[in-house]
């Protein structure tokens, strides 16, 4: 199939006086171009990923670049065979990335870490007295990361400042490098690090996505794939020596396939092979496998007898019905 669609990833810190009004107008504009995706708008700027046919994404980029609010905006562009979203959403938010720093909030246009090009980043990672901090969530790290990067034990970005404070001794008197998918989280996080007293802080300009597209570094020193927040879920980065670092949630075998737990009240994202999805009814715990609203059971129209037969193989049982 020909790759007639484009996926645009972008952000821009600026001042949007009326995020609600802007979001409403921007949604209408995106729909007029038949785009699909997710765009967040806040008083501090805009952050989005959209997909559409090339002529439509070209028109979108042209309009955004012509808007004085977004002068100098940079788009990361991927080619795809189809849309990577089902709908188009533009939503106002208090923050573009949720750190909840309140009075300690950082304006990346005033305070942020030094931007390193992909080539500079590769060289910096190999230097002594340097630590590399992954600014993403644990499940993003697990499917792919820079070699030797520290994995903060966090489920959400807002937990990162507390984690840094609790582990501060690891980073004192060292150069800190930090990275994320497209760069937006690190713009604010690196500024926060400097505000906390860390003096030598740098970030990967354009994030992992830009690093993977650089014609010179070609994603070298990246292990696994990069998690993305659309229907693709992961994209390749290392075009020199690709590896698999993700591990199946159930048996630990190499895996890069993400699914959501079939218990809608859990919805945990796990790495899981097709074989284990069927074996474990896409449930991440025994409780999720017997949940009365288990989506796997519903999708495959399993009768109670068929459901129990699957559980028998695991030594588990459906709860007794009253």
From Swiss-Prot:
GO BP term, pick one: tRNA modification
PROSITE patterns noted in UniProt: RHODANESE_3
Reactions catalysed: uridine(34) in tRNA + AH2 + O2 = 5-hydroxyuridine(34) in tRNA + A + H2O
Catalytic residue list: 180 (cysteine persulfide intermediate)
GO molecular function: oxidoreductase activity, acting on paired donors, with incorporation or reduction of molecular oxygen
EC numbers for this chain: 1.14.-.-
Uppermost EC category: oxidoreductase
SMART domains on file: RHOD
Superkingdom: Bacteria
Transmembrane annotation, as ranges: none
Signal peptide coordinates: none
Domain Rhodanese: 126-220
Function in brief: Catalyzes oxygen-dependent 5-hydroxyuridine (ho5U) modification at position 34 in tRNAs.
HAMAP family in the cross-refs: TrhO
Entry similarity comment: Belongs to the TrhO family.
Record protein name field: tRNA uridine(34) hydroxylase
């Amino acid at each position: 199939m020909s790759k007639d669609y484009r996926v645009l990833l972008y952000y821009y810190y600026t001042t949007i006086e009326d995020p609600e009004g802007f979001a409403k107008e921007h949604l209408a504009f995106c729909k007029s171009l038949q785009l699909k995706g997710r765009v967040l708008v806040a008083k501090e700027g805009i952050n989005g990923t959209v997909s559409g046919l090339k002529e439509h994404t070209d028109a979108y980029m042209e309009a955004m670049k012509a808007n004085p609010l977004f002068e100098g905006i940079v788009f990361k562009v991927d080619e795809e065979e189809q849309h990577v979203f089902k709908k188009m959403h533009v939503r106002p938010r208090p923050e573009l990335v949720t750190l909840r720093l309140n009075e300690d909030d950082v304006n990346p246009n005033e305070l942020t870490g030094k931007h390193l090009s992909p080539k500079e980043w590769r060289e910096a990672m190999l230097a002594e007295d340097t630590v590399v901090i992954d600014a993403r969530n644990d499940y993003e790290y697990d499917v792919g990361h820079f070699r030797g990067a520290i994995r903060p034990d966090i489920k959400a970005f807002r937990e990162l400042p507390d984690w840094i404070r609790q582990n501060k001794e690891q980073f004192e008197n060292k150069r800190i490098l930090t990275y994320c998918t497209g760069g937006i989280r690190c713009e604010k996080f690196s500024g926060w690090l400097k505000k906390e007293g860390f003096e030598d802080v740098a970030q990967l300009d354009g994030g992992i996505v830009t690093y993977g597209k650089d014609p010179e570094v070609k994603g070298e020193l990246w292990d696994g794939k990069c998690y993305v927040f659309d229907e693709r879920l992961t994209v390749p980065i290392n075009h020199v020596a690709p590896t698999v670092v993700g591990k199946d949630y159930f048996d630990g075998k190499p895996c890069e396939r993400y699914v959501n737990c079939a218990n809608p009240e859990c919805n945990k994202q796990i790495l899981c092979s097709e074989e284990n999805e069927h074996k474990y009814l896409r449930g991440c715990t025994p409780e999720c496998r017997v949940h009365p609203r288990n989506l796997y059971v519903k999708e495959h129209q399993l009768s109670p007898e068929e459901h129990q037969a699957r559980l028998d193989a695991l030594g588990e049982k459906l709860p007794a019905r009253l």
